[in-house]
Curated annotation (Swiss-Prot):
Function: Catalytic subunit of the periplasmic nitrate reductase complex NapAB. Receives electrons from NapB and catalyzes the reduction of nitrate to nitrite.
Xref: HAMAP family: Nitrate_reduct_NapA (MF_01630)
Domain 4Fe-4S Mo/W bis-MGD-type, chain residue ranges per copy: 41-97
Enzyme Commission designation: 1.9.6.1
Signal peptide (UniProt feature, chain positions): 1-29
Protein name: Periplasmic nitrate reductase
Names of required cofactors: [4Fe-4S] cluster; Mo-bis(molybdopterin guanine dinucleotide)
Catalysed transformations (reactions): 2 Fe(II)-[cytochrome] + nitrate + 2 H(+) = 2 Fe(III)-[cytochrome] + nitrite + H2O
GO molecular-function terms, A-Z: 4 iron, 4 sulfur cluster binding; electron transfer activity; iron ion binding; molybdenum ion binding; molybdopterin cofactor binding; nitrate reductase (cytochrome) activity
Record's subunit section: Component of the periplasmic nitrate reductase NapAB complex composed of NapA and NapB.
């Protein structure tokens, strides 16, 4: 091949530069650009789009496109590291099937439930939506509409959604997909401490002597945090790592001791540890006497099923969250049956191993960090299980000090910052307030400038009940934003899909890709992703982080915030509030919901000139909307233990952990000297409770609603893998991640495979009375279940494994148990 001298010099320069970077280029690569002016990449910070760890990344943009990402070396969370998903963030927005225009089901030029998707304008899309919402409101009132949101919403998007639904439509039928992942953690925080979110922080990783993972595969689900545990373990020989799970996974590789237990028996193990602490005189009496009270939970509370379900009808106290005061002696008596022998019989873990674990909690010189995610939260007694672990830490006083931390890890980037802190749950308001409390409603109405009585005091429909109401025709207009619940939620065939396809209902899905949810909807709205908009997230350690918009969205895609605000412009106050309420605020007569909720002198208080040049949402509204929403929202928590810094501050730092008082973040809550809200002289102050005392709550073992039988003889557990996130909407569109793990597999014990004449790679039918899926078996690899259990991840849209999951919930948190249901495995010839 001939090459000119100019071409040779150019190629040689490129090859020399590549060699320095450790990359080999072909000598004929003459099309490479070597001018720095043409290759300059602009870098800016943003929190990662995936899990709740809250890693900060540097985002590289060029020519209006994200071209690279890297770990942020200035970030205290990840210290320059990323997991495999984080390294490919630059590709999540550029899938070939990105939805770029609204798509409405149509036939003969008109909307038709049975029609095919066709592109329409934003005006047609939103006008059609508004027509359907008005019809549902007229037919059913505020309960006739609903919204299912996300722990991936930005703080501002979630806050705007809460205002639209609870203040605008006066409907509490809004819930986030965090109901599926964090509701049990929230429930236990509120019951035990009277205030939500962890008291510890990530600094605990560098201070603990023992780590105990309760139903958490951190090696794959929180890999950056796992590196901190690994570093602590490998750098300090005395440190121990304990992993409890119903099956072997990658976190066991570092563990000093692994504990495989029978599904649901974690309740017995936790009660045994409490009993061991008492029997071995390891109670920290000074702490317990000064800082705790004892309660007994109501038992036999059912499983959150439909009222006419035979399993639910057997419960003596269905859905009861009542507690009664008890003495320490009564508490001692309640855990006494959970001996090492009894707990071993129930769990399958040896007595010796159980005692090994209990000793680490009981030793006053050992700082213990307990960590958990879905194994504990996705549990029909998840609130109880969370509380039982708090009991252990409270009995020993191992709480809210460096290295002593019961720590609930979150799975989504803003499950804390948006779902929990903003209050996008059907029963909550911002800053831990609830709709059922008249004082909380009054505070919210005052901040939002609403007439008295606007907010509805009855909690709305949570995630599972929303499905049932759609199926029953009680919710007729429904908006799904920033999640893929048709794939992620339970009992798809029986409850959810019939509701989506109910002819009475109009379903809207806002998403960047044609997910299973989008394909089951009637209208798809194309959504801006991640750095295509400005926003803020809140991570698992209470760290709030903000970012600027860095590129424009593809096609006609708009942010969820823009969609919510534009939709609100289509409703006059008289159409949604009714004459009686409008009469209390005659100045609002004739105004739109947009005028009342978002042009209220607070949200629109900051001029467009304060925003960055690239801020499509601010330009659309004519004011700095993100700052206005954030500052109005922050007013709920300031002075009430949820203090946030001024919005602009978050653009100059790598996040701050609330409460932020006088510019200083809080590392350990409830501890005098660390938490500004802890009273002087208190030592510990659990100020979420009126008397400043946390609760030690007695709760027994109770069986799951279904167990294996002769026909359905195997346990099924669902979950995630390292390479994919949730339903794979983003990660399956990254070629490298898709190629690494293209298909979900059924991980099965070799003995169970042999019984069924199965070999690795064989296709099987996994079935129960709710449905069936086809999947290939894997007898080796990262996940190794014990005999009697199979594990199947839920990222694969071709294998909707969650259709097999019963929509049973923890009756207190309303969170579904995705970790245990009976199935049978049949070989496909």
């Amino acid at each position: 091949m001939k090459m000119t001298r100019r071409a040779f010099v150019k190629a040689n320069a490129a090859a020399s530069a590549a060699a320095v970077a450790g990359v080999t280029l072909p000598a004929s690569a003459t099309n490479l650009i070597v001018s720095s002016d043409q290759t300059k990449i602009k870098w800016d910070k943003a929190p990662c789009r995936f899990c709740g760890t809250g890693c900060s990344v540097l985002v590289g943009t060029q020519n209006g496109r994200v071209v690279a990402t890297q770990g942020d070396p200035e970030a205290p969370v990840n210290k320059g590291l990323n997991c495999i998903k984080g390294y490919f963030l630059s590709k999540i927005m550029y899938g070939k099937d990105r939805v770029q225009t609204p798509m409405l089901r149509m036939k003969d030029g008109q909307y038709n439930k049975d029609g095919d998707f066709a592109p329409v304008s934003w005006d047609v899309a939103l006008d059609t939506m508004a027509e359907k919402w008005k019809a549902a409101l007229k037919k059913h009132g505020p309960t006739g509409v609903g919204m299912f949101g996300s722990g991936q919403w930005t703080v501002m998007e979630g806050y705007a959604a809460v205002k639209l639904m609870k203040a605008g439509f006066r409907s509490n039928n809004i819930d986030p997909n965090a109901r599926h992942c964090m509701a049990s953690a929230v429930g236990a925080f509120m019951r035990t401490f009277g205030i939500d979110e962890p008291m510890g922080c990530y600094d605990d990783f560098e201070n603990a002597d023992s780590f105990v993972l309760w139903g958490s595969n951190m090696a794959e689900m929180h890999p950056v945090l796992w590196t901190r545990i690994s570093d602590r373990r490998l750098s300090h020989p005395h440190v121990k790592v304990n992993v409890l799970s119903t099956y072997y996974h990658r976190s066991f590789e570092l563990a000093d001791k692994g504990y495989i237990f029978e599904p649901q028996s974690d309740l017995a193990i936790a009660n045994f540890i409490a009993n061991y602490i008492i029997q071995n005189n390891a109670v920290n009496w000074d702490f317990v006497n000064k800082h705790t009270n004892f309660k007994q939970a109501t038992t036999d509370i059912g499983y959150g099923l439909r009222d006419d379900d035979p399993i639910q009808m057997e419960a003596a106290n269905p859905n009861s969250g009542a507690m009664s005061s008890i003495s320490f002696e009564e508490y001692k008596k309640s855990v006494a049956p959970y001996t090492a022998q009894k707990a071993s019989e129930m769990s399958g873990v040896s007595e010796e191993d159980l005692i090994t674990l209990a000793k680490q909690y009981a030793d006053p010189k050992t700082k213990v960090m307990s960590l958990w995610t879905m194994g504990m939260n996705q549990h029909t007694r998840g609130v109880w299980m969370n509380s039982l672990v708090y009991n252990i830490h409270l009995l020993t006083g191992k709480i809210a000090t460096p290295g002593n931390s019961p720590f609930s890890l979150t799975g989504q980037p803003s499950a804390c910052g948006t779902a929990r802190e903003v209050g996008t749950f059907s029963h909550r308001l911002p800053a831990d307030m609830v709709v059922a409390n008249p004082k909380h409603r009054a505070i919210s109405e005052k901040i939002w400038k609403l007439p008295e009585g606007t907010l509805n005091g009855k909690p709305g429909a949570h995630a599972v009940v929303q499905d049932r109401m759609l199926k029953d025709g009680k919710i007729n207009a429904y908006w799904v934003m920033c999640n893929n619940n048709m794939q992620a939620g339970p009992n798809i065939n029986t409850e959810r899909l019939p509701g989506y396809r109910n002819p009475e209902n109009f379903i809207v899905c806002s998403d960047p890709y044609p997910t299973a949810t989008a394909q089951a909807a009637d209208l798809i709205l194309p959504t801006a992703m991640w750095v295509e908009k400005e926003g803020a997230y809140g991570n698992a350690e209470r760290r709030t982080q903000a970012w600027y918009q860095q590129v424009q969205a593809k096609g006609e895609a708009k942010s969820d915030l823009w969609q919510i605000m534009e939709f609100s412009k289509r409703f006059k106050v008289e159409e949604v509030w009714g004459e009686e309420l409008v009469a209390k605020a005659p100045e609002y007569r004739g105004k739109t919901m947009y005028d009342i909720l978002f042009k209220n002198g607070q949200v629109d208080a900051f001029p467009l000139s304060e925003a960055q040049e690239l801020n499509d949402d601010a330009k659309a509204q004519g004011f700095y909307v993100q700052k206005g929403l954030f500052e109005e929202y922050a007013s709920f928590g300031r002075g009430h233990g949820h203090d946030l810094a001024p919005y602009d501050t978050y653009h100059t730092v790598r996040g701050l952990r609330w409460p932020v008082v006088d510019g200083k973040e809080t590392l350990w809550r409830f501890k005098e000297g660390s938490d500004p809200y802890a009273k002087k002289g208190s030592d510990w102050d659990f100020y979420g409770k009126p008397d400043g005392k946390a609760l030690i709550i007695s709760a027994p073992y109770e069986a799951p609603p279904e167990v294996p039988n002769d026909e359905f003889d195997m346990w099924l557990c669902t979950g995630r893998v390292l390479e994919h996130w949730h339903t794979g909407t983003m990660t399956r569109r990254v070629p490298e991640l898709y190629k690494a793990v293209p298909d979900a597999l059924c991980y099965i014990h070799p003995a169970d495979a042999k019984k069924r004449n199965l070999r690795r790679g064989d296709e099987v039918l996994i079935s129960n009375k709710r449905g069936e899926v086809r999947v290939r078996v894997e007898t080796r690899g990262r996940n190794r279940p014990p005999e009697g259990l199979v594990f199947v991840p839920f990222f694969d849209a071709r294998i909707l494994i969650n259709k097999l999951i019963l929509d049973a919930t923890d009756p207190l948190s309303k969170q579904t148990d995705f970790k245990k249901c009976p199935v049978k495995i049949t070989k496909i010839a």
